[in-house]
Each structure stands twice: as C-alpha cells, then as structure tokens.
Amino acid sequence: MRAPLSTHDRCLVPDTYDIRLTITGNDGDKYPAKQHARRAAMKLGVSAGLVYLVGQPTINWGDSDQPRPFRQRRYFYYLSGVDEADCYLTYDIHSDLLTLYVPDFDLRHAIWMGPTLTIDEARHRYDVDRVCYFSSLQGHLESWIDKHNNSSPIYILHDTQKPHVPSRENVYLDGEHLLPAMDAARMVKDDYEIRMIRKANQISALAHRKVLENIHRMTNETEIEGLFLATCVSHGAKNQSYEIIAGSGKNAATLHYVKNNEPLHGRQLVCLDAGAEWDCYASDVTRTIPLGPDWASEYVRNIYCLVEKMQETCISQIRRGVTMKSLQDSAHFIAIQGLKDLGVLHDYDVLEIFHSGASAVFFPHGLGHHVGLEVHDVSVQPNAASAAAEGPRQTFFVPMATQSSPGLEPGMVVTIEPGVYFSELAIANARKQPLAKYINFDVAEKYIPIGGVRIEDDILVTHSGYENLTTAPKGEEMLEIIRRAIDN
C-alpha cells in the first residue's frame, strides 16, 4: 500500500512517495543514538528544550588545501552514531524527536571525493527519527524558537557552537548544563558500547602479540610502532586511540614518550603503550617487554614483578562501590613496601612515606581513568579534584588519577595501569625536596637505565565484580611467546 508522506517524513524524501522494499539489519544493529539522547535528557533533568550539537566540520591544514584527518566530535557521536563530517543534530526533549542534518548534495564534491551521505542512506543507517539536509536547519530552528517563545532553552555544549539564527534575537541558550549531563550519561556504557571497546581490545591484543613475535628481530623503536600500526590497519582499525608510545631504555620513564625513533641496542626493555580504536571507541593497553628471551637483570625482573603485583591486587579489588581513590592508595602501599624491600626507599613507616609523596617520585600518575569514546573518557570532575587533593602529593607532579565517579558502577570501563619509573629528572628534583630523606638515591640511580615498567588493562565493572577486556599477553605468557619466536 502506498500512502502520502506525512509532514514529518517530508524531511526524509521530499515531495514523493516511499515505495521501496529494503531488507536491513534490525535496530539492534544500529548505534543506540536514541537511547543515548534519552539518557542525556534524563541526566539534564528537564522535560523540554532542544539539544543542539555540531559535528566536526571539514577543516584544512593552515596555509594548505589538504584536509586535516577527520575525527568526529565525541559528544556528537554519542547522540548520533554518525562518523561523517559536516553534520548537525537536534533533539527535541518534549517531543522525543532526534533529527540529523546531513550536507546538501554537492556535484563538485561528489565528482572529486564521492557523494556525501543521502537522506535515505542516513535514515536507514542511523538510529534517528528524522533526517534532513543542512539547508533546512535554520528554518527548523526558527520555527522551534517561535513555537516555544523562549519558554525552553536550546542546550549547547560550548559558546563557540551556537546555532546560526540571525533573524531571531535574544535566543534562550543554555551552555552550562548539557556538558555535565552528557558526561554523566557517558560514564556508564551500554551493551553496544562495551562490544565496541571489547573489539578494540581484541585488535590491540593481536597487534601486541605480533610485536612480541617479532621483537627479537627489531633494531629501532620505529619498527615497533610500524608493526603495531600495520597489524591494526590490516584488521580494520585504521585509527589509534592515542599516539603510540614505544619507549625503550630510559625513554620508558617518560610517560607520554612518542618520538619512537631510537635504537634498541643495549637496552633492557621497551614500554609499549598502544591501543586501537574501533568505531570511535578506544582501547588503552600497555605492556612492558624484555628485549630478549628473559628479563636482562634482577633489577628489571624485580620491578616488573612489583608492578605486576600492584596491578593484580588492584584488579582483584574492583567491584561496585569501590572508589578509584581507594584502589590508587592500595597501589601506592604495595609500591612503597616493594621499593622498601629493594632498598630504593628507606625503612620508614609505609603511611609516613605515603603521606610524604615520596612514592609519587616513582609512581607519578593516577592508577586509571575511564575508557570510552575518548581514551581518557569523561567523568565527574568534582571527585577527581577531591581525590587529587587527598592522595600522596608533592610539588612537582600533578596526578592524572581519579578521573572517576565517587564509586564504580556496573557498565563503567576503567584502566588499571600501575607503573614504577626511574626518571633522572624526577630523581634529581626529589633530592631538593623534604621527601628526599625517604629515598636511597644510591640505590635508586642503579635502576635509571631500566627506565620504567607499566602494565595496563581495560576493566569492565560488572554486577558481580569485573571482567578484564584486555587479552594482550603479559607476564609469563608474554615471555613464552618471545622465546618461541626466537627458537623458531
């Protein structure tokens, strides 16, 4: 049966009849944009208003005709599932109407770059109620403003993303409440999002394993980065969640070392922090790898075993209601006792050392963070500030940690990434601090050639405890892979 399109549908296919027969996946295959929009509205705590989001525009490099690599704005993606440039989105909270605006057809662009997304394609691909061309956006906004007569606001993320309605004055805009509401919504992942993070971790694990199988042949950090990238791309993950960190020797003590261009000869280990992205969702994985069939010295083995203990203990403590602050404190207590046993720290009381901040010379960052659409995903900021204020601190490090909710909830994905580092800069600076009395600098300096050790996994909080989403080999399994590759 053919029926005229309603006014609502004319945005989909203007002035025609919808007489197609299509067989598509069910809505469960689509990114759950409508569910996310409703969740964000619930966090806003209002029953009316218009959410207005601007997608990432096409932008060229400065003084160039070449475009910057496209990366969709994450808040836009969360409410749309659209990974296309130059799109817009509105969500009418009262009428529960989610509308996507796609670029109008441009013949020149289509000839050079291929056609942009059509209304029909977008409607069937995305979980939205209505799809329109961008040329209709201003008129729709004007109609909405006139209808509501400033009784309800247009919610925006930033003042730089205001809607363009020059014909209307004194538009009621709210740029304060949408961002924290969407942050609160994004913290707990739904089943679809967890599948994406799991897939990103699976590809990351393949790439980490490939590096382990070939590390004995490599002579430069560049080769590690290249092989990891190639493996991810060959499995469909063209983007990385962040710049690859492949720091060997002393470079492993630089937390975000990304030059990845130095020779491996004469060095004992490499810290490989690298995670693939899948459909805009991140993974965050770190493995510390020996440059040989075993750890090069007892110094290296001892530090690896200490970090391994820190991670295993903290992961085992994850459950609903536990705070990242308590987990980070636990990691510091283990690090302090371990460094005391190795003679790096003098034999003072563990709590005294903790409160002095001396352990942060060797473990200067947070234990973990949320993972999702960003590798350092959104969280509730007040808790982050309070946790940073309460933890071990000193004057020359600002902890990353505790970008987390007050208590972990099922559906959250967080990293557990303890590390112990021997940074020449940090150790030299520590000599000038009151905390210097807790550190045995003669012993600490013997560990400087190691650089540092970090182990990182992505952990899903569940109703019964946790699930480790990261399957990249570590520990004895990692060593066995390296040995088998050498033997073959």
From Swiss-Prot:
Binds 2 manganese ions per subunit. One of its GO terms (molecular function) is metalloaminopeptidase activity. Mn(2+) 1 binds at D284, E417, E456. Catalyzes the removal of a penultimate prolyl residue from the N-termini of peptides. It catalyses: Release of any N-terminal amino acid, including proline, that is linked to proline, even from a dipeptide or tripeptide. Pfam families: AMP_N (PF05195), Peptidase_M24 (PF00557). Belongs to the peptidase M24B family. Its cofactor is Mn(2+). Its EC number is 3.4.11.9. It comes from the Eukaryota. It is an enzyme of class 3 (hydrolase). GO terms for biological process: proteolysis. The keyword Manganese applies. This is Probable Xaa-Pro aminopeptidase ATEG_00858. Keywords: Aminopeptidase, Hydrolase, Manganese, Metal-binding, Metalloprotease, Protease. It comes from Aspergillus terreus (strain NIH 2624 / FGSC A1156). Mn(2+) 2 binds at D273, D284, E456.
